[in-house]
Design a protein with these regions (language model features):
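UBC/E2-like fold recognition across ubiquitin and ubiquitin-like conjugation systems
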Residues: 1-149
Length: 149
């Protein structure tokens, strides 16, 4: 089983190196089962110019089960827990399919930066502020990401 995982991860790694993902840099993959990278905040969002460290931890069940994906610092966002875990359907076992991969996860996260889902909050305060006062929400995000520029 582990051999299948390693082959799959090497294939994904080769694809990322051949066709880099916009706004994403793979920083460390010296352990094929744990990848660390940097995800840039998308343009025209309050997260713009932010550089967010992210970690993918793959299990021997990958790609049958999704990797554990988390940010390595606190990001003020309705769908991100304070410990860096991410609340997005794609990363749940019942929504994951083996046809998905690191690229689809990155694209999903970039979309989440552009269009948070306040109806499924990991951070209730951020969700409520996003719904009630988008200007104040954007200001709080910009204040938070100053540490990550």
């Amino acid at each position: 089983m582990v051999t299948i995982v390693i082959k799959r991860l090497n294939k994904e790694l080769n694809n990322i190196n051949k066709e880099p993902i916009e706004g994403f840099t793979l920083d460390d993959y010296s352990n094929i089962m744990i990848w660390k990278g940097t995800l840039e905040g998308p343009k025209d969002t309050p997260y713009e110019n932010g550089k967010f460290k992210i970690q993918f931890t793959f299990t021997p069940e990958y790609p049958i089960k999704p990797p554990n994906v988390k940010f390595l610092q606190y990001i003020y966002h309705p769908n991100f827990y304070k410990d860096g875990q991410i609340c997005v359907d794609l990363l749940q076992n019942h929504e994951w399919s083996p046809s998905q991969n690191v690229c689809t996860i990155i694209h999903s996260l970039r979309s989440l930066f552009m269009d948070p889902n306040p109806s499924s909050p990991a951070n209730r305060e951020a969700s409520e502020l996003y719904i009630k006062d988008k200007i104040a929400y954007d200001a709080k995000v910009k204040e938070n990401i100053r540490n990550y520029i």
